[in-house]
Amino acid sequence: MKLSSFKFTLPSKLIASHPVENREDARLMVVHKRTGQIEHKTFKDLIDYLGENDTLVLNDAKIFPSKLYGSKEKTGAQIEVFLLRELESGEHLWDTLVEPARKIRVGNKLYFGDGELVAEVLDNTTSRGRTLKFLFEGTREEFYEIVDQLGFVPLPNQLKRKPETEDRERYQTVYAQHIGAVVPPFAGLHFSAHLLKRLELKGVHITPLTLHIGLNSMKIIDVEDLTKYRIGSEQFLIPDNTVTTVNTALDDKKQVCAVGTSTIKALETSVSVAGRLKPAQGWTNKLIFPPYDFKVCTSLITNFHLPESLPLVNAAAFGGYELMMEAYQIAIKEKYRFFVYGDAMLII
């Protein structure tokens, strides 16, 4: 399929710069795959579409304030470092993006805060990419504590604003557990603890997996032929208890609802020949685009995504290309909010 098929005009005013006051008060478009029916609801109405013994699968990856501002040794020039991925746990070796890249060279030392963190540039990986070694003698947990104090929430440029205090809480799901992601699962941002409890009381099984989302969800795809697109690998874990819960739902012909395209990516990475979920841990660069035969998920919660973005392609693979493009035109007409802090869609 061609990338240009996913191009549409999105008014910039529909890109939400801030979240709604209450997570579950975002709007929810419900799209019925089989009939093409479209309903306009509020996110808390999700409870009406999930029943007893249905399963809701969450991505519990936790982001951290991964954007650091510092200075170069000797010159004192101001620099910016975006921590992308920890390369060796406990060794404080990181894959990063830096600005201004042309001034940050191998051998440079970079200082953050009042010298609480010092890093040495070990390698150039891309035009903006650098491998940094943080000269830090503490534990991994102590390192993250300092980063939490010095770092800023890495909001996407499309929001056109600097991070604010509320982003520390709102740019994170209420169920985040495992630190390592640089982007949160957008669809999960709509869940409040209250809504999750209501779902549990209704008999919905809520079960986690972990996929540490990288920058793929922020990027606009840069090749026309989607079969030639190469995405970075992301670390994931599907625990045994989630496998049992999901497979039981499939055996009982109950819904398996994935929260976010990162969740369907993890689930579809680890499917047996018989169409059942398997425990898995490792890295995935699975690319999902139309047409695609989903083996595990029966419904999907996702946000409204930017044109020519990977999450949009994933959503179209699940909901059907024509129906998704129709739904997006309706969303624009009805002034739904897009992107990270935008509204949600339930595809059933």
Curated annotation (Swiss-Prot):
Q: What class of enzyme is it?
A: transferase
Pathway the protein takes part in: tRNA modification; tRNA-queuosine biosynthesis
Q: What is its main location?
A: cytoplasm
Give Gene Ontology CC terms: cytoplasm
Q: Does the keyword Cytoplasm apply?
A: yes
Domain of life, per the record?
Bacteria
Localization in the cell: Cytoplasm
Protein name in UniProt? S-adenosylmethionine:tRNA ribosyltransferase-isomerase
Species: Amoebophilus asiaticus (strain 5a2)
Q: Gene name? A: queA
